[in-house]
């Protein structure tokens, strides 16, 4: 991007935003003059600069998401949380001073027990309920996933076992058929008729009988 184009973009943005852009540009120009600019500008400011210079909506969404994330971090317990000062006790009104001591004792006991247990804070109760519900939902989801995965694994195992048994039975039948073919070919006399000596003749009952060559060979007559 040339400097002339950059100046044109600056003028366009300045005319559109008015006085807000003047303050923003002055702060950006002061930061851009610094040699270690990338160490000064954080991600949110860089996203805002890119949003104004290039007009990318994604950068604007990034800055908004970062702001939302910062607000969520502020709401987390233990991070910038204003804890109430339990040491400072409120002084009762004169109308409350007229009450008897017997009416004050159960209130103090209940307050102390409730503050120790933390039952009076509705935010903590809601957080605990949400945490319990989320943990129970996660455990239920995990159990469902394990159940579905176990069912799928069992189905795959049974399918593979059935395919293995089927292949074994097919191979057994194939080998048995080949064995039967070979035994039938070996035992059948018709297959050995051409290889048998000419002085033997096959009978109708598949038995062999010896004959003379003069009786079988017409050339001998």
Swiss-Prot record:
Region (Disordered), start-end ranges: 75-149, 183-221
Secretion signal span: none
Coiled-coil features, chain-numbered ranges: none
Biased amino acid composition, Polar residues: 84-101, 183-193, 207-221
Basic and acidic residues composition bias: residue spans: 116-133
Superkingdom of origin: Viruses
Role: Does not belong to rhabdoviridae replication core genes, and is specific to sigma virus: protein C is presumably involved in host-virus interactions.
Protein name: Protein C
Species whose genome carries this gene: Tupaia virus (isolate Tupaia/Thailand/-/1986)
Lineage summary: Viruses, Riboviria, Orthornavirae, Negarnaviricota, Haploviricotina
Record gene name: C
